[in-house]
Amino acid sequence: MKLFVFLALAVAAATAVPAPAQKLTPTPIKDIQGRITNGYPAYEGKVPYIVGLLFSGNGNWWCGGSIIGNTWVLTAAHCTNGASGVTINYGASIRTQPQYTHWVGSGDIIQHHHYNSGNLHNDISLIRTPHVDFWSLVNKVELPSYNDRYQDYAGWWAVASGWGGTYDGSPLPDWLQSVDVQIISQSDCSRTWSLHDNMICINTDGGKSTCGGDSGGPLVTHDGNRLVGVTSFGSAAGCQSGAPAVFSRVTGYLDWIRDNTGISY
């Protein structure tokens, strides 16, 4: 059922003259599978804040998102870009069996006003939803507090989740997958990517990665269970290529989220 947005990379052509390594620049391409690789099946209720998003517009495409309030979902701007509406799937462990769904139109999608589809700066969007009651299978994830807005989270462990394939070329799994990953510093990630300050990266050593994962989906810290990343892009070379996977850094958007939703910690 699910084909998740994945992002390919434009890589500079090699020349015969030795030169410093050139950083990679992301280029979004829709309708390519994202993947959770070398993860594990998430037990029912482990990730009650994740939603599956089926967008409609010029075609249909799938992304992930995170419940941050009774009437709000956070996702990626490259997911909402060009959408005329979205069906939100709540409480699914088996990807084809959500507890319930809601549909909302483009008027309830708030895409970051400075989103740049060329370099994926400000790759973040909000979706205003009908009110949902929280219970064991459908619940919110908390944002970082304002006291942590300058925290870089380097060295912290986090969990990413989604319904993407479990290895390069694999079919989509029926069951929600999670993977435990370590956040790396901006300086380490900048060796591979041309980064914006409001991006955050994970180490993919050992083939553990979202590799783009469910674009728009969550990266949540083990310590404190705070949503610190929104899945943005990964390497087109494959999920086990070793390149860091990149997320929008939620702490960089706390003011924007508060101004649009009233949610803050």
Curated annotation (Swiss-Prot):
<dbReference type="GO" id="GO:0045087">
    <property type="term" value="P:innate immune response"/>
</dbReference>
<dbReference type="GO" id="GO:0005615">
    <property type="term" value="C:extracellular space"/>
</dbReference>
<dbReference type="GO" id="GO:0017171">
    <property type="term" value="F:serine hydrolase activity"/>
</dbReference>
<feature type="signal peptide">
    <location>
        <begin position="1"/>
        <end position="21"/>
    </location>
</feature>
<comment type="similarity">
    <text>Belongs to the peptidase S1 family.</text>
</comment>
<dbReference type="GO" id="GO:0004252">
    <property type="term" value="F:serine-type endopeptidase activity"/>
</dbReference>
<keyword id="KW-0378">Hydrolase</keyword>
<feature type="active site" description="Charge relay system">
    <location>
        <position position="78"/>
    </location>
</feature>
<keyword id="KW-1015">Disulfide bond</keyword>
<dbReference type="InterPro" id="IPR050430">
    <property type="entry name" value="Peptidase_S1"/>
</dbReference>
<dbReference type="InterPro" id="IPR001314">
    <property type="entry name" value="Peptidase_S1A"/>
</dbReference>
<comment type="function">
    <text>Major function may be to aid in digestion.</text>
</comment>
<dbReference type="Pfam" id="PF00089">
    <property type="entry name" value="Trypsin"/>
</dbReference>
<feature type="domain" description="Peptidase S1">
    <location>
        <begin position="36"/>
        <end position="262"/>
    </location>
</feature>
<feature type="disulfide bond">
    <location>
        <begin position="63"/>
        <end position="79"/>
    </location>
</feature>
<dbReference type="InterPro" id="IPR018114">
    <property type="entry name" value="TRYPSIN_HIS"/>
</dbReference>
<protein>
    <recommendedName>
        <fullName>Serine protease 1</fullName>
        <ecNumber>3.4.21.-</ecNumber>
    </recommendedName>
</protein>
<keyword id="KW-0645">Protease</keyword>
<keyword id="KW-0732">Signal</keyword>
<keyword id="KW-0865">Zymogen</keyword>
<keyword id="KW-0720">Serine protease</keyword>
<dbReference type="GO" id="GO:0006508">
    <property type="term" value="P:proteolysis"/>
</dbReference>
<feature type="disulfide bond">
    <location>
        <begin position="211"/>
        <end position="239"/>
    </location>
</feature>
<dbReference type="InterPro" id="IPR043504">
    <property type="entry name" value="Peptidase_S1_PA_chymotrypsin"/>
</dbReference>
<feature type="propeptide">
    <location>
        <begin position="22"/>
        <end position="35"/>
    </location>
</feature>
<feature type="active site" description="Charge relay system">
    <location>
        <position position="215"/>
    </location>
</feature>
<dbReference type="InterPro" id="IPR009003">
    <property type="entry name" value="Peptidase_S1_PA"/>
</dbReference>
<dbReference type="InterPro" id="IPR001254">
    <property type="entry name" value="Trypsin_dom"/>
</dbReference>
<dbReference type="InterPro" id="IPR033116">
    <property type="entry name" value="TRYPSIN_SER"/>
</dbReference>
<feature type="active site" description="Charge relay system">
    <location>
        <position position="123"/>
    </location>
</feature>
<feature type="disulfide bond">
    <location>
        <begin position="189"/>
        <end position="201"/>
    </location>
</feature>
